[in-house]
Amino acid sequence: MNTTAKCSLSALVLLLLANLQAAHAADQPNILIVWGDDIGYWNISAFNHGMMGYQTPNIDRIANEGALFTDAYGEQSCTAGRAAFVTGQSPFRTGLTKVGMPGSDLGLKPEDPTIAEYMKTRGYMTGQFGKNHLGDLDEHLPTNHGFDEFFGNLYHLNAEDEPEHPDYPKDPAFRERFGPRGVISSTADGQIEDTGPLNKKRMETVDDEVTARALDFMERANDSEKPFFLWWNSTRRHVWTRLKAESEGVTGLGIYPDGMVEHDGHIGQLLDKLDELG
């Protein structure tokens, strides 16, 4: 769940990378957008110049090869910020101002335009991978709003692990009505698969899963000789993130810096794939 300050991430890591070398036509560059979660601008070494005690060289690479923004506006919640980006509209217009929760009917509506729908009309393969937070119901899924493929979770992490809490209601009817869905895999042809819960253990590696899916999507788009529009959304560095053993202790500064380094590594994989395909 993002605060206004932390949503400055939207201005920094809402990164539009046009890989012109890999483009299939001069007017159709591949487009990769990367988002994190609960990341402030000062958590990125391009801004803090090492003052946080760790480096984010892959994110810094985007700043060095592109632009570094020093003025930004962030919405007050994850749902509002993501809705503003994907629709290009104020959340007051779409109604997506609050944090989306399991069991809620709040989400993208059929009449809400999305950038993915537009990119489809331009001949792009469209994929969204990672955290969505734009609605709980099937009708809200990205694959009903312009994306060819989606793989990811639907809420903030502390909503995902609620059923593991000892005081979570034991009534099956409550779980059915208000329990979180798992990690969803869906396609625009209507196929929807719940791949299992995003429990505390899976949180350690879910960004690995999401990144692998994104890399595969990039490969398939390249093989199909189609430009791609890819929106990648990690769960790092949400405040409730759990890290896998290999990521713990890499900075010696605690779980948040360790998670930032892991997050930067995932972005590096995506950038390397762009270079490879080019």
Question: Model-derived features: where do they sit?
Answer:
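N-terminal secretory signal peptides that target proteins for export/translocation
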Residues: 1-7
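Formylglycine-dependent sulfatase
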Residues: 8, 22-278
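Bacterial N-terminal signal peptides
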Residues: 8-19
